[in-house]
């Protein structure tokens, strides 16, 4: 009897221990698919870190913990990432497809570290971001230190962990055109400390390479060595991430910039050893002060890791790094998707099978912004709608609508549109820049300036792919291109596309510049379990009820036409898995987007009430016209931003809604609280929700409606898959213990 009881107790302890170990293993992710190993250590710091990891298997798991230190190990190569948090800041790092050896960092596809003020998203705080290429430094250690007011800054760089006070010493040993490219924050010229509510910038010269210099408002600083150094002077906004890559800045000064200084140099010194091509690409909007990126060495990195800083008052979407680079031909990198305003995404070429979990849906913060990227094999449909933020007082409230479409045989493209001489009036000039294969022996950077009313541009690019060679850019206003650009591919370019035949088309439009800020409203979101992106619009259903018979006062319904049916109304399907409310696990209370009224039915008008004063302009008059009934797609759950009309926009590459094949369940409401309690963090999405695509519907002021399909993203639906495993294991342990005890009792 004693032995039997001992066995029972031992079994119960073992099951409980197994459950605890399972959760621990889930936290450490040692069993995680791929070669990602994440160690989360509680440093008991004053703050919460959100560390999210997903890989090519599209599995996504979120671990929230108090501070963290992560170690990524594979083979003999170790990467240590020290993440330090302060206060209520959140840190996120996305790592995907990690498979490292001694010098093979090329599978580090995602690196994303964002700092948020979880209380009110105060722009006075700076954000520190650290690139994986800093791993080349001492002992392959990267220190990511998030800074707040008064903190000293020490971040890793090519020399290892370098303090600001030692930057000049390091720079002087290598050359004058060296910036501490990984130093982030807002500094004075004589202090390491962050200064709040002031505007500073950094410029490069031979004596003070990379030192942050105070920038008076609306002042343009120049040096004898560099003619076009434009500080980030924008009245009313503090830019904490004034990173500078390369020795020359892309200048947007209206008075003191020369055309000859508008492009980055062919090569500049760099402190990453052996093989760096010396080609840095950096674009700055003088109103945004936004760094976009750079390329790296081919000898050390076969995939190009990139980290981008962002304006701290805005939301950093993330980084996607896909393209495997050719050591022989040099890096092949493009910085993508920029239209003057908020800059949210950087894409790197890749022609392998893309990640299924590749959609990023940043939430609107100060304005309306949605970015969605869909990968279907080698084909990408890329739709964007956004406006600049409204946190400046220089009249920069604009609406930008950007639609892109590529034929199935064209696998990549790049489009950049920058404000060239200001965007104060309609018809302002914009500059489109394309950068192609940076490993080519000749400059492939070119510009085309065109009015805001131009609708189409064709972009030229060279790709390091056997079946894709060379394209070019052309617009109806002006053409300034290098016909092929890549010398070593000139023959193939000529053979495949004689006379530069058009093979890729990018359609864009900047419809108008408005006097009032563009406002946006989050009404709800729909999930689509399966989509056919390239299929034609769904045929008219034959199960609809017949129209009522005509009366003497009502004309008979018109005969059916071949025009496309209007988009369906937003109805929440209760058959879908429970959706997690947006909690402070990933968003500050001010950014929680669970709407006040999202229980939309066929006869419910779209309620255009401000959801959040952070990004809704209460003074803007919104159209309160109701939506129109339409057949409901199956399993739809979704995001609708701003007003909805029944007139589909001429959106390029928009995926049609699949025809309904299941009855529509009664709608349900989404929690409407804007300040969720910490307990709500435990609400999770099921694994099926991870693969469920989302529909986003946007409407511009010009009446265009844009439907975008994407995948859920952590910003939209924080969840923990650990909860299900833990509950299941605990329940099984308890039930098994009770069963054994009962059996023993009855046997006795």
UniProtKB/Swiss-Prot annotation:
- Can the keyword Nucleus be found in this entry's annotation? no
Q: Where are the transmembrane segments?
A: 724-744
Which residues are on the Extracellular side of the membrane?
Answer: 21-723
Tell me which GO cellular component terms the UniProt record holds.
Answer: host cell membrane; membrane
Q: Which residues lie on this side of the membrane: Cytoplasmic?
A: 745-748
Key words of the record: Glycoprotein, Host membrane, Membrane, Signal, Transmembrane, Transmembrane helix
Major localization listed first in the record, in broad terms: host cell
Q: Which residues are glycosylated?
A: 55, 78, 99, 152, 189, 390, 467, 499, 573, 584, 599, 612, 617
Q: Please list where the region (Disordered) is annotated.
A: 531-574, 650-680
User: What name does UniProt use for this protein?
Assistant: Putative transmembrane protein ORF88
């Amino acid at each position: 009897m004693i032995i039997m009881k001992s066995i029972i107790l031992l079994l119960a302890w073992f099951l409980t221990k197994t459950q605890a170990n399972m959760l621990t293993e889930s936290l450490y992710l040692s069993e995680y698919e791929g070669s990602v190993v994440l160690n989360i250590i509680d440093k008991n710091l004053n703050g919460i870190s959100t560390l999210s990891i997903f890989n090519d298997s599209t599995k996504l798991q979120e671990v929230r913990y108090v501070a963290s230190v992560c170690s990524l190990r594979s083979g003999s190569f170790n990467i240590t990432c020290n993440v330090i948090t302060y206060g209520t800041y959140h840190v996120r790092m996305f790592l995907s497809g990690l498979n490292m050896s001694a010098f093979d960092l090329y599978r580090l596809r995602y690196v994303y570290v964002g700092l948020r003020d979880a209380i009110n998203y105060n722009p006075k705080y700076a954000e520190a971001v650290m690139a994986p290429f800093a791993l080349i430094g001492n002992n392959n250690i990267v220190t990511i230190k998030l800074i707040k007011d008064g903190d000293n800054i020490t971040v890793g760089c090519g020399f290892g962990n370098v303090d600001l006070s030692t930057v000049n010493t390091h720079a002087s040993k290598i050359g004058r055109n060296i910036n501490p490219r990984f130093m982030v924050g807002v500094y004075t010229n004589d202090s390491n400390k962050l200064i709040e509510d002031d505007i500073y910038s950094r410029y490069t010269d031979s004596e003070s390479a990379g030192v942050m210099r105070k920038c008076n408002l609306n002042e343009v600083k120049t040096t004898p060595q560099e003619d076009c150094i434009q500080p980030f002077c924008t009245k009313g906004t503090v830019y904490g991430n004034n990173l500078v890559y390369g020795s020359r800045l892309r200048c947007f000064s209206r008075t003191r910039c020369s055309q000859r200084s508008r492009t980055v140099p062919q090569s500049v010194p760099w402190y990453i050893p052996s093989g760096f091509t010396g080609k840095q690409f950096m674009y700055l909007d003088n109103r945004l002060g936004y760094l976009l990126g750079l390329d790296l060495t081919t000898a050390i990195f076969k995939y190009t890791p990139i980290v981008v800083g962002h304006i701290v008052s805005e939301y950093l979407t993330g980084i996607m790094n896909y393209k495997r680079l050719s050591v022989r031909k040099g890096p092949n990198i493009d910085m993508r998707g920029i239209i003057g305003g908020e800059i949210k995404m950087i894409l790197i070429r890749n022609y392998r099978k893309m990640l299924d979990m590749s959609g990023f849906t940043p939430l609107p913060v100060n304005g309306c912004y949605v970015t969605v990227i869909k990968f279907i094999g080698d084909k990408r449909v890329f739709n964007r709608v956004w406006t600049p933020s409204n946190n400046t007082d220089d009249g920069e409230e604009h609406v930008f609508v950007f639609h892109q479409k590529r034929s199935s045989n064209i696998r990549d493209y790049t489009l950049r549109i920058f404000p060239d001489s200001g965007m104060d009036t309609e018809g302002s000039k914009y500059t489109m820049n394309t950068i192609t294969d940076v490993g080519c022996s000749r400059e492939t950077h070119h510009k085309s300036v065109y009015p805001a009313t131009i609708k189409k541009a064709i972009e030229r690019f060279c790709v390091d792919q056997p079946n894709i060679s060379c394209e070019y850019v052309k617009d109806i206003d002006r053409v300034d291109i290098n016909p092929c650009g890549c010398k070593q591919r000139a023959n193939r370019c000529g053979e495949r596309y004689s006379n530069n035949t058009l093979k890729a088309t990018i359609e864009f439009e900047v419809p108008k510049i408005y006097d009032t800020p563009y406002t946006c409203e989050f009404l709800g979101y729909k999930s689509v379990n399966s989509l056919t992106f390239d299929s034609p619009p769904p045929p008219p259903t034959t199960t609809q009820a017949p129209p009522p018979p005509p009366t003497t006062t009502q004309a008979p319904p018109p005969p059916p036409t071949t025009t496309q049916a209007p988009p369906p109304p937003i109805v929440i399907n209760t058959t879908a898995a429970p959706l997690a409310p947006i909690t402070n696990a990933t968003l500050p209370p001010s950014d929680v987007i669970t709407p006040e009224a999202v229980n939309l039915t066929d006869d419910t008008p779209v309620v255009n009430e401000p959801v959040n004063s952070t990004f809704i302009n209460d003074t803007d008059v919104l159209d309160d016209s109701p939506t129109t009934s339409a057949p409901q797609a199956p399993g739809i759950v979704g995001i609708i931003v701003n007003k909805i009309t029944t007139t589909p926009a001429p959106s390029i590459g928009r995926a049609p809604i699949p025809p309904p094949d299941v009855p529509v369940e009664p709608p349900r409401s989404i929690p409407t609280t804007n300040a969720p309690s910490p307990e709500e963090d435990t609400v999770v999405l099921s694994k099926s929700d991870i693969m469920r695509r989302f529909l986003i519907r946007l409407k511009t002021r010009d009446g265009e409606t844009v439907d975008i399909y994407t995948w859920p993203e952590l910003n939209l639906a924080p969840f923990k898959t650990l909860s299900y495993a833990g509950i299941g294991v605990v329940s099984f342990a308890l039930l098994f213990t009770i069963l054994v005890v009962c059996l023993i009792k009855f046997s006795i």
